[in-house]
């Protein structure tokens, strides 16, 4: 099966390819010559995930004939949010650009991930409730236009400080439920088996069967 993942994020591509396994060939946007910037204007994870999948699907199967020419079976996109209980579910849909939206640049304007993590730790100072969850919404659109949305959630808590050098994004401050280490401290194979994205992709792989 050949699927296009609506992303050029190298970390996400590596993770998704590891999760879905060798039986599914995952193509990046670059590999199908998609160069358009997709503005994530949705107000929910579901809306953003759908927006990305629809934009790429239309490009492959309506605006061009690339989808049919390359025997592509479908397109999928994901949107992930960190939802911190004590902050009313923030940053949620704004997870990737939270610090920039808040004008919070302790590490300089170019250090997006570092600033996001710093803002999470700063916002929870003095609070005992550090419960949080990562939620990933995946939208899959078949070559014939049939659409399905699936979800993966991993509950956990926000650490008191950054720990670990693996992973990306908020991984150094997120401790998954049942573990005493952050995602960034866990082996990649373990993280890929229990993460929110892994659970969403597992749901997708089961639906595809």
Model-derived segments and spans:
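Anionic-ligand binding patches
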Residues: 2-4, 10-209
